[in-house]
Regions:
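Short secondary-structure junctions
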Residues: 11-18
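Short, small-residue-biased leader/transition segments that mark boundaries at the very start
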Residues: 1-2
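Conserved C-terminal structural/oligomerization subdomain of aldehyde/semialdehyde dehydrogenase
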Residues: 22-148
Length: 148
């Protein structure tokens, strides 16, 4: 609620959300008019809230996406998938989805962020590689015979 309250106090508009029902702990929220001075823009959130931020053009959208210390996951939505891939490659995040949600996890895929969102990669071989160091230990059980 902190992210939503801060954004609304600074001029953003609540497009949907806020309705409490008996079976929902926290309803989803869509907030429009989010600017760079709002917590919803600046801080990493795992709650059911999305901020709508308008960009002037593609370059501005990439700049906005990268203007944060966090970088767990991003998504690019477009009709032109080649353009979406080009944009995705410029966004500083551990994961970037083209035409898919920011939450997509598969056990065999490396999952993790960059910047303040990063502690390595979880999942499959990447998880093992991130949290282990390769060592080589040899042992001879019999004395060696070396020609000296």
């Amino acid at each position: 609620m902190l992210f939503r309250s801060d954004a609304l106090a600074k001029g953003a508009q609540l497009l949907t959300g806020g309705e409490t029902t008996q079976n929902v702990l926290m309803p989803a929220h869509v907030v429009s008019g989010v600017t760079q001075d709002m917590k919803l823009f600046r801080d990493e959130s795992f709650g059911p809230v999305v901020g709508v931020i308008r960009a002037r053009d593609e370059a501005h959208a990439i700049k906005l996406a990268n203007d944060t210390e966090y970088g767990l996951s991003a998504a690019v939505f477009t009709r032109d998938t080649a353009r979406g891939l080009r944009v995705a490659r410029q966004i500083k995040s551990g994961i970037c989805h083209v035409n898919g949600p920011t939450v997509h996890d598969e056990a065999q895929m490396p999952f993790g962020g960059v910047g303040a969102s990063g502690y390595g990669r979880f999942g499959g071989k990447a998880g093992i590689d991130s949290f282990t160091e390769l060592r080589w230990i040899t042992m001879e059980t019999q004395p060696g015979h070396f020609p000296i």
